[in-house]
Amino acid sequence: MNKVPMTGEGFASLKEELRWRQQEERPRIIEAISEARSHGDLSENAEYHAAKEAQSLNEGRVNELEDLIARAEVIDVTKLSGDKVKFGATVVLVDEDTEEKKTYQIVGDQEADVKSGRISISSPIARALIGKEVGDAIEVNAPGGARGYEIVQVQFI
């Protein structure tokens, strides 16, 4: 069984989603199925088929969440230290062309959200950063072409 690295925050988020799907969404869907059944003929009952599809999607996600939680390797980022970039690090970069600063935290695949500065450990930029230190330059092949960055800060917060 492959372990899935994630932060404590990411683990808590998965557990909350699982709780919501099991304790709130599942009963709501069951009620919708029951309500749709009461309308009679199921073969042409769009509400019934929509509710059954929602049930299938919800149960699939519940199974996925249970698997992820079982395989989770929760890493307490605040207990990490050092100068090298690794999982959990918050890294400040400067774009070598535009001088624009960007801050990213390297997190597990399930936690990634680029808009909030959380990038997946398996993303091209994170793979380029792993093992590097402050002052190192990296080059990332992005869809818009190669981009160069300098690492100006590495912290574990």
UniProtKB/Swiss-Prot annotation:
Pfam families: GreA_GreB (PF01272), GreA_GreB_N (PF03449). GO terms for molecular function: DNA binding; RNA polymerase binding. SUPFAM superfamilies: FKBP-like, GreA transcript cleavage protein, N-terminal domain. It comes from the Bacteria. Disulfide bonds: none annotated. Transmembrane segments: none annotated. The keyword Membrane does not apply. GO terms for biological process: DNA-templated transcription elongation; regulation of DNA-templated transcription elongation. Keywords: DNA-binding, Transcription, Transcription regulation. InterPro entries: GreA/GreB_C_sf, TF_GreA/GreB_CS, Tscrpt_elong_fac_GreA, Tscrpt_elong_fac_GreA/B, Tscrpt_elong_fac_GreA/B_C, Tscrpt_elong_fac_GreA/B_fam, Tscrpt_elong_fac_GreA/B_N, Tscrpt_elong_fac_GreA/B_N_sf. Gene3D superfamilies: Transcription elongation factor, GreA/GreB, C-terminal domain, Transcription elongation factor, GreA/GreB, N-terminal domain. The keyword Cell division does not apply. Coiled coil: none annotated. Necessary for efficient RNA polymerase transcription elongation past template-encoded arresting sites. The arresting sites in DNA have the property of trapping a certain fraction of elongating RNA polymerases that pass through, resulting in locked ternary complexes. Cleavage of the nascent transcript by cleavage factors such as GreA or GreB allows the resumption of elongation from the new 3'terminus. GreA releases sequences of 2 to 3 nucleotides. NCBIfam families: greA (TIGR01462), PRK00226.1-2 (NF001261), PRK00226.1-4 (NF001263), PRK00226.1-5 (NF001264). Belongs to the GreA/GreB family. This is Transcription elongation factor GreA.
